């Protein structure tokens, strides 16, 4: 299997005891499975919950605190316990754990966004395991991600992950909460998430979790909109994540089956994404895109119209004004205007992902081939 970029999110209930407090056996089981995925050559980014659940006991609370200050204080205690446990467990497999604590405003600022991307990329290049949680102790309630399910979907989208795996205490999505309705039936595969499913999904099932299945479905829908397929479920043992990636997991698969994920992203670009602008390319770039399977580079761009942002979808037209394809851009319109016609190495500083391509091959869909300019 080709190298995959996988975002794994682990919920509080899968890391702590029902009454709170870190469960080292549960945590080790996940670490072993992540280490195995890395040994198979995949990139893994971990989104971990559990700071509040791990910290409230040691801080002296009998149950998960309900006040914001209580949760924030518990998270400050629990986060360091979590990282201590991850660092020592990953070290047993020869991997280094790296902590990143995010707030929603990190996603609003392009500069922070860019730094975050560069940091995670550098960590992955060096073989480390990026471990992300919300920076609970400083997050302001109105500005939180909602929960780590949504955070994991946003991270999976912006890292162009191949798959988002939401590990939880239940083996998938049911048509009703199985903890309260024993007749509930499990979905094995869903092509999409409908409003009805979100309505039907219930809330939290454990004393330590946050959003329940509803928040997972909202997150799954967000991930699908970025072209990332999702798995919600459970598992145990070293091979559980590899099995999930191979389509053999105990849970619900949402979107296109993982190996065919690229196809889905392209479908989204071709048929669903709003088109935010237009780029004109010269005949060399047109030929590279249509005949040689290459990415679009800044050097081949001759004109830019519309007010698009980086990662928006734009139409690409040739010198005759004929639309030849559509793709997701790494540059905002204003930046692309500055760098059109320039060498990639000069231009890439303006791309928020530091990527030289204007449209990477993976984010390109050909709409007309017969129109190549002569
Ligand atoms: N339709 C549903 N299908 C499956 N689980 C559901 C459903 N509705 C509610 N749940 C509950 O969601 C829980 C998982 O959510 P949560 O406790 O937030 O987990 P985590 O801590 O892993 O994020 C399950 O234990 C289950 O009780
Ligand atoms: N950031 C919080 C987790 C919030 C959260 O979404 O929890 P969960 O529903 O268990 O994934 C913490 O570390 O306690």
UniProtKB/Swiss-Prot annotation:
Record PROSITE patterns: GLUTAMATE_5_KINASE (PS00902), PUA (PS50890)
InterPro entries in the cross-refs: AceGlu_kinase-like_sf, Asp/Glu/Uridylate_kinase, G5K_ProB, Glu/AcGlu_kinase, Glu_5kinase, Glu_5kinase/COase_Synthase, Glutamate_5-kinase_CS, PUA
Keywords: Amino-acid biosynthesis, ATP-binding, Cytoplasm, Kinase, Nucleotide-binding, Proline biosynthesis, Transferase
Record EC number: 2.7.2.11
Provenance organism: Geobacillus kaustophilus (strain HTA426)
GO cellular component: cytosol
Residue positions binding ATP: 9, 168-169, 210-216
Name recorded for this polypeptide: Glutamate 5-kinase
